[in-house]
Amino acid sequence: EIRYLGLEFGIGSYKTNPPNKVFEQRYGDCKDKSLLMVKMLEELDIKAYPMLVNSTLKNTILELPPSPEFFDHCVVKVVDNNDNLMYFDPTLSEQSGTYKNRHFPNYEYGLVVDKTIKSFDTIISNSDNTVYIYEEYDIKDLKGKATLNVKTTYTDVEADRMRYVIKNTAKTSFHNELENFYAQYHNNVRMRKNPVIEDNKDINELIIKEF
């Protein structure tokens, strides 16, 4: 694992560390991780290039004069043997899915770091990024108790985010958060049993079933 750590001062703000150093120290910023990924892919005879983006400007960057100051992030562009284009952000964690459907943020435009390149790549995100919630109420009568079953399906980046939350939250705290959410809408809500989590990593889908 190469941790994402940026030391944004001095020459380190612009110059990458050698890939061997990044691999040995096990950390690096966005440009360090991107260059390392590019070199590793090149060793496998896969065409790859570092690419500069701006995480917030989107298409506004097309209207600005050329300047390195307008880029705040570095990612990777990959060209496979069939000339298909793919984009990867090595700084993202807890990602699942295959290399063909790995989530890539909607940066919209990116500039490949290559002296022969003079125009932007147009980037179209292929991620679904949805949350589907299915709630099933079982009401015996209007005065008695009722039960609620909930199935929430997270896809693409939403699955990545929830995977990160689950990994970095104590189990008891996570269960309490789920229960407290529905306590905002229903009185005397109690979880009947622990939630069931299904992580379908091949398609980057995470399902939480609550009872």
Please give the residue ranges for each predicted region.
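A sensor for short, sequence-defined functional sites
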Residues: E1-F211
